[in-house]
Amino acid sequence: MIEFEPKYITFDCYGTLTKFRMADMTREMFGNVLQGDDLEKLVAFYAGYRRDEVLGAWKPYRDVVVNALRRACKRMNVEFNEVEAEKIYTAVPTWGPHPDVPEGLSRLAKKYKLVILSNASNNQIQSNVDKLGAPFHAVFTAEQAQSYKPRMQGFEYMFDQLNCNPEDVLHVSSSLRYDLMTAHDLGIKHKAFVKRGHEPSTPYYQYYEVNDIPHLAAELGL
């Protein structure tokens, strides 16, 4: 059980709540030119370059998505098509939640104020949020904060907007590298790692582990 009453439960969205399909779309897009291990290398390089693209000054999410794929294609010596790359970006608002999410969030929303902090575009995120099946107190984007996670600025922006402190929230994510390592460094004591399979558990960062969002609700007594 989680023996803590947060003022807010703050969530990462893409990957944690929304089923993030960039790897799937990359496989579909390049499956005719790469196979097996080479295709998976491209997928992995694309993920890595996306992380690298968000570490500097803020830029539109479209540029993050497209630039990272351009770099991954160069690394794998395959042809890059910017029009095709933009299709990945434009698909983002069509993606819905992991199957467990609506039930779990609905249970949590009966008691807690739910908040999203997402590496998202302002003009895309609401479409994803509308598919989650529960009300949110606030939704904050990297575009609003002018900074992407894992940089700290987005978290600091969220705390300022909510008029709260790191100690007041339970932050929930399926990503150590984008969220929970930064949350640890910011002094967010209460964190939950949702085991979606993108990253291995790293207990050093001191979080609760849950299998899905209903499991999180159960750990909070709901």
Describe each region flagged by the PLM:
Residues 2-99:
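N-terminal helical cap/lid subdomain that shapes the substrate entry/recognition surface
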